[in-house]
Amino acid sequence: MAAREEVLALQAEVARREEELSSLKHRLAAALLAEQESERLLPVSPLPPKAALSQDEILRYSRQLVLPELGVQGQLRLATASVLIVGCGGLGCPLAQYLAAAGVGRLGLVDYDVVEVSNLARQVLHGEALAGQAKVFSAAASLRRLNSAVECVPYAQALTPATALDLVRRYDVVADCSDNVPTRYLVNDACVLAGRPLVSASALRFEGQITVYHYGGGPCYRCVFPQPPPAETVTNCADGGVLGVVTGVLGCLQALEVLKIAAGLGPSYSGSLLLFDALRGLFRRIQLRRRRPDCAACGERPTVTELQDYEGFCGSSATDKCRSLQLLSPEERVSVIDYKRLLDSGSPHLLLDVRPQVEVDICRLPHALHIPLKHLERRDAESLKLLGEAIREGKQGTQEGASLPIYVICKLGNDSQKAVKILQSLPDLDSLLVQDVVGGLMAWAAKVDGTFPQY
């Protein structure tokens, strides 16, 4: 028995190390690519002045040319403007699409990621045939088909402290369409150091928000958020979900603000934050705090005079991928391969699925008992009663005096670890073996059952 436990512990530790190694390899590849790009980034010359619109341009942009607020001079400004878009996902796609359609002269596209099928519900520049291609090349191709006169400059790399300032200085306006906190601080600081306005938006579930930082003496991102939030409190779209239309609404609002800045009209949301609630169909505008004299980036005596280690500052990685928690020891975890062996052996046990009901409706293992993590966190009496009954029923298949092991599973292996901690703290269960399944159901789909849905 002791030997078997050691094998399980070692296998769990190997799985954990493999996951860490995979993450490190990804970061190394991104860093090497960024290093290469920083060494061979071609100079981007300023767009030449434009004295008049061609006959084709007058026809193409005729509906906006007749707007007195824009007119010919505004269109000429757009034609010589350049915009850097950080992130070619749910926000960046509609933003870039409308900027290209409106005739902005140059669009810089920054994204290290590739197109995945799960992107297509909201990232409207990409298509099924382009799965696996770098997002910036997919987006650039779509934009060129829309408007061949717009220059698209793809940067297939992660934005890093080594490259950000150089890139930002090449463009007139910057749009932050990223989905992680370290990149938000990085883009903000680069814009402050380069003296560029920053149009920033975010979207999650049915909600979104947009503002403009560092414009006309207004606040920057650090004025509003001097310190990053605890990493464990941050939810991204992969974890929390998002309705594609919501990212479309916010991306279009970003495009509107960028166009007004580029045309010389000025933005609407410098110093204020627009909140969008799609479920209730409401927009709400709130005033942000003014520029802080003691701001570390844009204050009177700034301490951020160069770009820094933002992943270290924020305690999280600069990616929109789900971060893996390490809350349990190897002895408290089991791989999906080992769990499959246990399942096939017919050994009595209880599998507890702690995902929300909405995820269980997508897919589930038929033999699992479902109790959402939130019910365990609040010690819901009905849920604990259900768990107790399942344990008593399961024990009927064990030898007399033997305990019933409990295995906890979720989507990715994070919530299951939290659930194990809770179960271990319950007095009625403290004598039972409780382990989480490493990698959750997505690991099950990848390593055990290729027909199991991934979401």
UniProtKB/Swiss-Prot annotation:
Q: Which domain of life is it from?
A: Eukaryota
Q: In which pathway does it act?
A: tRNA modification; 5-methoxycarbonylmethyl-2-thiouridine-tRNA biosynthesis; Cofactor biosynthesis; molybdopterin biosynthesis
Q: What is its EC number?
A: 2.7.7.80, 2.8.1.11
Q: Write out the ranges of the annotated region (Interaction with NFS1).
A: 156-236
Alphabetical list of InterPro entries matching this protein = MOCS3/Uba4 (IPR028885), Rhodanese-like_dom (IPR001763), Rhodanese-like_dom_sf (IPR036873), ThiF/MoeB/HesA (IPR045886), ThiF_NAD_FAD-bd (IPR000594), Ubiquitin-activating_enz (IPR035985)
Top-tier EC class:
transferase
Kindly indicate whether the keyword Zinc belongs to this entry. yes
Catalytic residue list: C237 (glycyl thioester intermediate), C410 (cysteine persulfide intermediate)
Q: Which reaction does it catalyse?
A: [molybdopterin-synthase sulfur-carrier protein]-C-terminal Gly-Gly + ATP + H(+) = [molybdopterin-synthase sulfur-carrier protein]-C-terminal Gly-Gly-AMP + diphosphate; [molybdopterin-synthase sulfur-carrier protein]-C-terminal Gly-Gly-AMP + S-sulfanyl-L-cysteinyl-[cysteine desulfurase] + AH2 = [molybdopterin-synthase sulfur-carrier protein]-C-terminal-Gly-aminoethanethioate + L-cysteinyl-[cysteine desulfurase] + A + AMP + 2 H(+)
Which cysteine pairs are joined by S-S bonds?
A: C314-C322
Required co-factor?
Zn(2+)
**Which PROSITE patterns does the protein's record reference?**
RHODANESE_3
- List positions binding ATP: G90, D111, S118, N119, L120, A121, R122, K135, D179, N180
Protein's job:
Plays a central role in 2-thiolation of mcm(5)S(2)U at tRNA wobble positions of cytosolic tRNA(Lys), tRNA(Glu) and tRNA(Gln). Also essential during biosynthesis of the molybdenum cofactor. Acts by mediating the C-terminal thiocarboxylation of sulfur carriers URM1 and MOCS2A. Its N-terminus first activates URM1 and MOCS2A as acyl-adenylates (-COAMP), then the persulfide sulfur on the catalytic cysteine is transferred to URM1 and MOCS2A to form thiocarboxylation (-COSH) of their C-terminus.
Name the family: In the N-terminal section; belongs to the HesA/MoeB/ThiF family. UBA4 subfamily.
Name of this chain's protein: Adenylyltransferase and sulfurtransferase MOCS3
Organism this protein belongs to? Sus scrofa (Pig)
Taxonomy of the source species: Eukaryota, Metazoa, Chordata, Craniata, Vertebrata
